């Protein structure tokens, strides 16, 4: 089965954007590679930030375990970022509990919508 390897993420400033995501996720931004500044996730997929004058915002969701959610969500709050329970800014200052897990939405410096979830949406809880 094919696996996703990388995603190109347009950014106003690739270094600022890569470092922002790395800081929130508690990982290290990778060294620049060509025109890209990658951030690697635990499953090996990289988000390759590239400078762009035209940033069309997208949505990126990260599946994390409960401990990672707690740590990343604490960093979101410590950074003073606005966060929401829903993708259209529903439930300001709240998280959601979809599918028996926890989820939260917030924006990166480019306006990309980032999401942390502890359960994949559509996966029914046991029992």
Question: Where are the model-predicted features located?
Answer:
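Short glycine-enriched loop/turn motifs at secondary-structure junctions
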Residues: 1-3, 53-57, 97-98
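Short aromatic/hydrophobic contact patches that present stacked aromatics
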Residues: 6-8, 38, 59-61, 103-105
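N-terminal beta-strand motif that seeds the catalytic metal site of vicinal oxygen chelate
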Residues: 1-15, 60, 120-127
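Vicinal oxygen chelate
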Residues: 62-109, 113, 120-125
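Short, charged/polar surface micro-motifs in flexible loops or helix N-caps
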Residues: 44-46, 54-56, 65-70
